[in-house]
A protein has these predicted regions:
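Enzymes that bind and transform nitrogen-containing heteroaromatic metabolites
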Residues: 1-228
């Protein structure tokens, strides 16, 4: 259970109650949420992975959001660093964003048929071994890719992005983030770890606070939606 700080009334709620709210897709593309965890000083990975930052409630948030997601979109580096495998939700697909096609197609994520690639038109990828959604040249055009996800999952309504920071920055620049589900861990990490968006131009995107929750470990769980 978590304690709701915003909106009133201030009461205990379950993760499912807080996060399984309706998301309405856009006319020409699905709703895109970004789910991340960060330290108090902004690091999103410790030792190359985000798992060391979270706690059981943060994991429950991630799993709850995945349970209502049609497609997970994640960068190739995050897939390698976090050890992504096939999703637990039947029929769910995982789109791996790569500009160069440098992924291991023998990984179970792809051999299971759950994983597919999102790559530029000129990326060196064996289309006979893996399903590929091509958008852009040299670098992925994420807006085009998100708008064409229905070619992979016809009924797609909700997409969850899970990093890493380079993908987050590209989504930010393309103004594709409709929702930010951000856990702030009650710890400082120091070091030179990556921040939430790496390499993005300076941008002012405004969001509205949908809820703010806290747990007994001092973790803060926020959900913001894009002000449009």
């Amino acid at each position: 259970m978590l304690r709701r700080v915003h909106p009133a009334p201030h009461e205990r709620v379950t993760v499912a109650e807080a996060y399984t709210v309706e998301r309405v897709p856009h006319e020409h593309r699905p709703w895109v949420g970004l789910c991340m965890v960060t330290s108090l000083d902004g690091t999103v990975a410790v030792g190359g992975a985000s798992g060391g930052l979270g706690n059981p409630n943060d994991l429950q948030v991630l799993l709850t959001l995945r349970s209502i997601t049609d497609v997970i979109v994640v960068g190739a580096g995050t897939v390698r660093g976090e050890g992504y495998g096939p999703p637990k939700k039947p029929g769910q697909r995982i789109g791996v964003v790569t500009n160069r096609g440098s992924v291991d197609l023998d990984d179970e994520l792809f051999t299971s048929g759950a994983g597919f690639l999102i790559a530029p038109a000129d990326a060196d990828v064996d289309d006979d071994r893996v399903e590929v959604l091509r958008a852009g040249r040299e670098v992925v055009d994420l807006r085009v890719a998100i708008e064409r996800l229905h070619e992979i999952v016809p009924a797609v309504r909700y997409v969850q992005a899970e990093g890493g920071p380079t993908l987050n920055a590209a989504l930010l620049e393309a103004d594709l983030i409709d929702e930010l589900d951000l856990t702030v861990a009650s710890r400082l990490s120091g070091g030179a770890g990556p921040r939430l968006t790496r390499g993005a131009d300076e941008i002012d995107r405004r969001f509205d606070l949908a809820h703010l929750l806290v747990d007994d470990d001092g973790f803060v769980f926020g959900r913001w939606t894009r002000r449009r």
